[in-house]
């Protein structure tokens, strides 16, 4: 089976499954995001080991997996994740590293990469937060909100690839990602703007009773597109340092979790923040 065939089969299965999971939300979404966060943390720690770092893998993976579940528990009023709890977690990691490994176990760098991995992989929690945004009334509205930044991230990727292959001449940041061009970045941004305007008009307004002004939609698309490209470059930088082509081979034809979600992890927190300020209710 060719690489392209595997990609197509995976996409055909993953797309409707993703929509269904986001639509039904609740524990199903929290558990899926928890698994994704755990796998993303594992991939990041795997790359870190290639550079000589010694992350606390079992603890880091477990904590990353707990974050989406904690957000779900917070929505249900069962538990509230506080800053004090996060600080206590970091101190506990540091203390356990010193106790188990001693100074030779690089406690400072071990804790630093572990905490970074937990927080980075834990960004999957923002998908859950956007699904249950304060302005989203009902499953359809929450699902429409989640897939707005998802679609813009995809549009940025497609636009950057297409315009880069067709018109690309000036390299964007060759030391990080030699294949990316300025023309591709601009093309990705332009396609994201077009898709955002269409999505707001034909999906968000009728199905979520929410909208954005034209200026708001353009601003949102620009910020999301820049964030998506930054996230992609950030993971390219990490992979370059680790000397690996893919973060793993978990997804058939697509590499690893971080290879597919690197842009979206940067986008989701920003999307949640911006939509809270730009969304407008549409009267029925």
Annotated model-derived regions:
Residues 156, 186-187, 258-268:
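Membrane-embedded alpha-helical segments of transport systems
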Residues 273-284:
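Juxtamembrane boundary at the C-terminal end of a transmembrane helix
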Residues 17, 69, 253, 268-270:
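Hydrophobic residues in alpha-helical membrane-spanning segments
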Residues 1-222:
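Membrane-embedded alpha-helical bundles of polytopic integral membrane proteins
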Residues 223-228:
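Transmembrane alpha-helix interface/packing and boundary motifs in multi-pass membrane proteins
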Residues 240-264:
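Interfacial loop-to-transmembrane junctions
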Residues 235:
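Acidic, glycine-rich loop-and-beta core segments that form the ion-binding/anion-interacting portion
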């Amino acid at each position: 089976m060719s690489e392209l065939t595997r990609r197509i089969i995976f996409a055909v299965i993953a797309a409707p499954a993703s929509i269904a999971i986001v639509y039904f939300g609740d524990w199903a979404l929290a558990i899926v995001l928890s698994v994704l966060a755990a796998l993303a943390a594992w991939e990041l720690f795997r790359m870190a080991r290639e550079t000589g770092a010694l992350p606390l893998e079992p603890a880091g993976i477990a904590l990353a997996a707990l974050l989406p579940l904690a957000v779900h528990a917070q929505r249900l009023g069962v538990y509230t994740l506080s800053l004090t709890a996060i600080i206590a977690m970091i101190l506990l990691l540091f203390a356990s590293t010193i106790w188990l490994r001693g100074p030779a176990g690089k406690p400072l760098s071990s804790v630093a990469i572990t905490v970074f991995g937990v927080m980075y992989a834990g960004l999957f929690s923002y998908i859950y937060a956007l699904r249950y945004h304060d302005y989203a009334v009902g499953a359809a509205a929450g699902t429409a909100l989640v897939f707005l930044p998802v679609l813009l991230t995809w549009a940025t990727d497609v636009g950057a690839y297409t315009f880069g292959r067709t018109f690309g001449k000036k390299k964007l940041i060759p030391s990080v990602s030699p294949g990316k061009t300025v023309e591709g970045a601009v093309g990705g941004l332009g396609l994201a703007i077009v898709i955002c305007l269409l999505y707001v008009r034909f999906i968000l307004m009728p199905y979520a009773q929410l909208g954005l002004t034209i200026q708001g939609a353009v601003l949102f698309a620009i910020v999301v597109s820049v964030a998506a490209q930054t996230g992609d470059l950030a993971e390219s930088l990490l992979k370059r340092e680790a000397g690996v082509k893919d973060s793993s081979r978990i997804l058939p034809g697509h590499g690893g979790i971080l290879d597919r979600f690197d842009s979206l992890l940067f986008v989701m927190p920003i999307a949640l923040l911006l939509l809270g300020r730009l969304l407008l209710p549409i009267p029925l």
